[in-house]
């Protein structure tokens, strides 16, 4: 959740875009409109015109580092914030590579939907890799 103590590059805009009840009466419902809001927000700020997928990748790694730190501290608000930030960055990176994040998610799910395997040391390992 955004607050004055946690001010990262995307947080306030993310909070305002997704938790503004005038625009999103159901803030917990995930749908394509949320990704459209991210893309509109990014376009308005020149991220697509002046940035590129390489800089978005660097931003993604920064956010991954913040997630790692939050996980180590078991800081639930920061974990949520970092995951949200990563979704924003991934949405932008996908768009810059001429993909829609929704299609990327659908493609990934189609690949794993029938995957079999087992848990090994806390990680799911697909059968082909065992």
Feature locations, PLM:
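Flexible "arm" and connector segments at domain edges
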Residues: 2-83, 87-130
């Amino acid at each position: 959740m955004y607050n004055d103590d946690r001010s990262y590059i995307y947080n306030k805009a993310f909070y305002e875009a997704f938790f503004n009840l005038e625009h999103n009466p159901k803030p917990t419902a995930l749908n394509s409109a949320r990704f459209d809001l991210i893309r509109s927000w990014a376009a308005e700020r020149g991220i697509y015109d002046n940035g590129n997928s390489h800089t978005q990748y660097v931003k993604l790694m920064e956010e991954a580092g913040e997630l790692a730190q939050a996980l180590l501290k078991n800081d639930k608000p920061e974990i949520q914030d970092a995951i949200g930030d990563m979704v924003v960055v991934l949405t932008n990176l996908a768009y810059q590579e001429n993909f829609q994040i929704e299609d990327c998610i659908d493609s990934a799910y189609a690949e794993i939907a029938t995957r079999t395997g087992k848990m090994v040391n806390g990680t799911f390992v697909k059968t082909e890799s065992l």
